[in-house]
């Protein structure tokens, strides 16, 4: 799987370098994003449903603004910097292959065009107890978990529960949200630190009751 990804990434980079060398940058947009998504496919899947074994979340249907922002965070080292964050480090390396102008917004546009998948829950938690804890989350992410672009709060509804739990732990443990340039990550970190392990499990269980509407 890893070798397959490197082969795909190398091919995408080679095509981009050739185009740049000829003075013809690829045209940004959905078609370009679909081609670039070949680099994402081995981990996130053709439909963007993710792969827990690889630490790859469901990304299908995420808003383009959020995908772009996180790709730029990985590219700049604001994510994937913790030495034991294997999935984050891998993602940071992948983001570096999107090095031509227009690459990031193009792949973000394609990801946003994919139909949300609403992965099935795999973790245990008390959703009723988590509803009370989610009140603090709803201030930014909304009561429906749909997110808020104005304050850079991503949608939570429809995301894999294991990924949400993993990100809360990363914020709590300083694997994410400690870079001074990651303003919105720094905003999130204190909220994660306020939750103990049971609280995280319960909030995540409640979020699983909020589902993305099909397109």
Residue ranges and their predicted role:
Residues 37-40, 56, 64, 88, ...:
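Disulfide-stabilized extracellular ectodomain repeats and their linkers
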Residues 52-58, 74-104, 120-125, 150-155, ...:
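Axial heme c-ligation environment in periplasmic c-type cytochrome domains
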């Amino acid at each position: 799987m890893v070798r397959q990804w490197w082969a795909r990434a190398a091919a995408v980079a080679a095509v981009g370098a050739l185009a740049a060398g000829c003075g013809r940058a690829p045209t940004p947009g959905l078609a370009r994003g679909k081609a670039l998504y070949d680099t994402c496919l081995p981990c996130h899947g053709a439909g963007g449903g993710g792969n827990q074994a690889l630490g790859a979340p469901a990304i299908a249907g995420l808003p383009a603004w959020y995908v772009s922002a996180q790709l730029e965070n990985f590219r700049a080292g604001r994510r994937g910097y913790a030495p034991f964050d294997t999935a984050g480090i891998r993602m940071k390396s992948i983001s570096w292959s999107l090095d031509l102008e227009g690459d990031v917004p193009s792949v973000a546009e394609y990801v946003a065009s994919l139909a949300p998948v609403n992965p099935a829950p795999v973790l245990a938690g008390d959703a009723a107890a988590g509803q009370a804890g989610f009140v603090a989350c709803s201030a930014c992410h909304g009561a429906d978990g749909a997110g808020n672009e104005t304050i850079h709060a991503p949608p939570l509804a429809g995301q894999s529960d294991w990924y949400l739990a993993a990100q809360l732990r990363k914020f709590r443990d300083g694997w994410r949200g400690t870079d001074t340039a990651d303003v919105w990550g720094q905003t999130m970190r204190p909220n994660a630190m306020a939750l103990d392990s049971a609280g995280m499990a319960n909030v995540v269980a409640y979020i699983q009751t909020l589902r993305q509407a099909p397109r």
